[in-house]
């Protein structure tokens, strides 16, 4: 199965709170370019999409959803910037085991996206993600590990 991890698009620097920072126009266009490239690789359907509740992540998903079919979309409070990567990885693994998902997308933030990638790919140093960056991991729920299939950067 494939786990896609995407960092939200570029966001405004200031807002009432970090959670309320909105996407910039550049953030939206870069996210759309990455989504289009992913769909062109043949990955346009997700069994489940997990999205951070923060405005910029929600806006990223809303923008890119035009390129994808999503069976289920869940706003997940655990995938905010300082979410616990091991807990999120356990949750995702359980979802995959129970529902036999083939493609799952996570739209989240630094530093979580890097740490989460390292949870799924053994011996990988947590990578830095550019805004709108996406990684696809070919993941085995039985082996509880995966390998990077591809990266897409804006």
Residue ranges and their predicted role:
Residues 41-44, 95-102:
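Glycine-rich phosphate-binding loop signature in dinucleotide/nucleotide-binding domains
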Residues 101-117:
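A glycine-rich beta-strand to alpha-helix segment
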Residues 87-96:
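A short, acidic, amphipathic alpha-helical segment used as a generic capping/interface helix at domain edges
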Residues 3, 101-105, 134:
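Residue-level preference for the first positions of well-ordered beta-strands
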Residues 2-3, 7-79, 83, 90, ...:
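Active-site-proximal alpha-helix that buttresses catalytic centers in soluble enzyme cores
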Residues 121-147, 153-154:
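Domain-level recognition of soluble alpha/beta enzyme cores
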Residues 93, 114-121, 135:
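A broadly conserved amphipathic alpha-helix scaffold signal in soluble, globular proteins
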């Amino acid at each position: 199965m494939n786990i896609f991890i995407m960092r939200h698009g570029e966001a405004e620097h200031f807002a009432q709170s970090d959670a309320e920072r909105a996407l910039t126009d550049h953030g939206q266009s870069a996210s759309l370019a990455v989504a289009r490239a992913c769909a062109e690789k043949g990955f346009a359907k997700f069994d489940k999409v997990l999205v951070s509740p923060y405005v910029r992540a929600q806006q990223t998903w809303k923008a890119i959803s035009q390129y994808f079919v999503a069976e289920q979309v869940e706003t997940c409070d655990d995938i905010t910037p300082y979410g616990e990567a091991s807990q999120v990885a356990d949750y995702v693994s359980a979802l995959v085991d129970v529902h036999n998902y083939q493609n799952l997308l996570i739209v989240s933030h630094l530093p979580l996206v890097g740490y989460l990638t390292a949870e799924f790919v053994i011996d990988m140093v947590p990578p830095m993600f550019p805004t709108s960056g996406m990684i696809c991991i070919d993941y085995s729920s039985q082996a509880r590990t995966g390998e990077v299939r591809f990266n897409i950067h804006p």
